[in-house]
Amino acid sequence: MAQAAKKQNLGMGRRKTSSARVFLRSGTGQIIINGLPLDEYFGRETARMVVRQPLVKLDVQSRFDVYATVQGGGDSGQAGAIRHGITRALIQYDEEGGEGGTWRSTLRKAGFVTRDPRMVERKKVGLHGARRGTQFSKR
C-alpha cells in the first residue's frame, strides 16, 4: 500500500530574473535549497536573513520545513524569490485553516506579499550601459 503523501503547501516566488518553487511542510525549521542547507547555499548572511524574514516575522521558524528549488539570477535575486515563495506558501497554509487567516495582513505590512517589479534596465545603443554615455571632452 502506498504511503499517504505528507501535506505541503506550494508557493511560487520571483525576483529579478530568479524564479523559485517553495514547498512548505510542518517540521523542525530545516531550510533546504536545491538540495543544500541554507547556510551552505548562501555564503552571505544578508541573503540568509532575507530568506528567513517571513518565518521570523510570524515567529514560526521552528514549525515548518522549507524545501526550495530556485534557478536564474544571482544571490540577491534568488534570496528574494525564495522569500516571495515562502510568503505565498505561508498564506496558502494560513487560509486553508492554519491560523485563521491573519498572516496575510501581517506579511503585507512587512512588504513580503508584493512581487518587486524592479528589473535591470536594458543597455542602449551608443551608450556604455543603460544610461552611461561617452565621456565629454571640451577640447
Swiss-Prot record:
Keyword Hydrolase: no
Species, as recorded: Coxiella burnetii (strain CbuK_Q154)
Gene3D superfamilies named among the record's database cross-references: 3.30.230.10
Highest taxon, organism lineage: Bacteria
Keyword annotations: Ribonucleoprotein, Ribosomal protein
Gene Ontology molecular-function annotations: RNA binding; structural constituent of ribosome
Protein's recorded name: Small ribosomal subunit protein uS9
GO process terms (BP): translation
InterPro entries with a match to the protein in the record: Ribosomal_Su5_D2-typ_SF, Ribosomal_uS9, Ribosomal_uS9_bac/plastid, Ribosomal_uS9_CS, Ribsml_uS5_D2-typ_fold_subgr
GO annotations of cellular component type: cytosolic small ribosomal subunit
